[in-house]
Amino acid sequence: QIWSLEKITSANEATTIPTTPTSAPASTPFKPLIEDGNYYIKTTLNPNFYLDVAFSSPADYAKIQLYSQWSKENKAQIWNIKHLGSNKYQIKSALSGKLLSFNTNHVSNNEPIFLLSEGNNNCSQVWQAEQVEGGFFFHTTCDETKALDVNGAYAYYGTQIQIWDKWSKTNKAQIWSLEKSLF
């Protein structure tokens, strides 16, 4: 499309202002919901419980659980969130550099979350963020009806993190708050 503007200087006079051809009008840059950086991710069921790598394991398939924060420097509870565009994010462990993931052969309720090395833009490693009152939903891009979830809506030491049907914008088992980490 080619656009031109006319400047009206009087009722009978118009001046055409040449413009550069463009395929689309300029738009405002997209601002992501979450700024890239390191965060603590907390359940809104109990703000004393954080997303945690079980036993601080750097291994593939390390279990992701809830645990209380025992040090601001604990890399097992620090997550690097990186915006990929359109409010899609990778969530990477500061401990190992591995990504929050799940088994894509079983995109179903109760599928546990674990760490896995980055691989081929796997949909299990890309999370769509949605801002809701009190925090964020993170649903998988493999199936937007499945969200990051606290098993049994029970915030306690070692509680499994899983995917589960997204069932309410007020379901605290699926709403996560973010706190910037300085580490």
Predicted segments — roles?
Residues 1-183:
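Lectin-like carbohydrate-binding module/patch detector with strong preference for beta-trefoil
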